[in-house]
Swiss-Prot record:
The keyword Zinc does not apply. The lineage of its organism: Eukaryota, Metazoa, Chordata, Craniata, Vertebrata. This is Mitochondrial import inner membrane translocase subunit Tim23. The chain crosses the membrane at residues 73-93, 125-145, 180-200. Component of the TIM23 complex at least composed of timm23, timm17 and timm50. The complex interacts with the timm44 component of the PAM complex. Belongs to the Tim17/Tim22/Tim23 family. It comes from Xenopus laevis.
């Protein structure tokens, strides 16, 4: 049954003539004869089969060829900034402790406040510089090792930590280089073990079964 009455069509035509034209009116019978070529029989709104749109795993919106995880270069900024902030906070607390310890016999006055503030500032800057320098060296070595090997795994972490310790203690001679390398190796190995602890536990439980 055609629901487009002549009166309504005339009304639309009259308004269209007043405002300079309007869209032509089509009845349902006219639209029913338009062929929908290329449409999938499973969905009248898509020209592809919806089964191809089903994803079994989570997908990320990334540029073509981009990795799904952050690389060493992207994490370097967070690592350096986090170490600087952590060092400044730890140094400030340590400086506050040392300031109160050194001025415990002084009366509470302006010189005492200035001395405590100087100690807080000095210790905060010292620790922020130390941890920031270590983070910078670690991140630089991590990026170099990643680009050289073409892979990102725990071996890069261990190698970067070892080289960071060796370079940081290089001013102490061969003995200092050895100590720094061993310290960096121990810390990096502990960090890698912590990151893979759940995987190691799962693998050991599967082997026991």
């Amino acid at each position: 049954m055609d629901t487009n009455h002549p009166g309504s069509a005339g009304g639309r035509g009259g308004l269209g003539s007043i405002f300079g034209g309007g869209p032509p009116g089509y009845s349902h019978s006219d639209l029913a004869g338009v062929p929908l070529t290329g449409m999938s029989p499973l969905s009248p709104y898509l020209n592809v089969d919806p089964m191809y749109l089903v994803q079994d795993t989570d997908e990320f919106i990334l540029p073509t060829g981009a990795n799904k995880t952050r690389g060493r270069f992207e994490l370097a900024f967070f690592t350096i900034g986090g170490c600087c902030i952590s060092g400044a906070a730890f140094g400030a607390l340590n400086g506050l402790k040392l300031g109160f310890k050194e001025t415990q016999n002084m009366p509470w006055s302006k010189p005492k406040n200035v001395q405590i503030l100087n100690m807080v500032t000095r210790q905060g800057a010292l620790w922020a510089n130390t941890l920031g320098s270590l983070a910078l060296l670690y991140s630089a070595f991590g990026v170099i090792v990643e680009k050289t090997r073409g892979a990102e795994d725990d071996l890069n972490t261990i190698a970067a930590g070892t080289m960071t310790g060796m370079l940081y203690k290089s001013t102490g001679g061969l003995r200092g280089v050895a100590r720094g390398g061993l310290a960096g190796l121990a810390l990096a190995s502990t960090f890698a073990l912590y990151n893979n602890w759940e995987h190691i536990k799962g693998s050991s439980s599967q082997v026991s079964l």
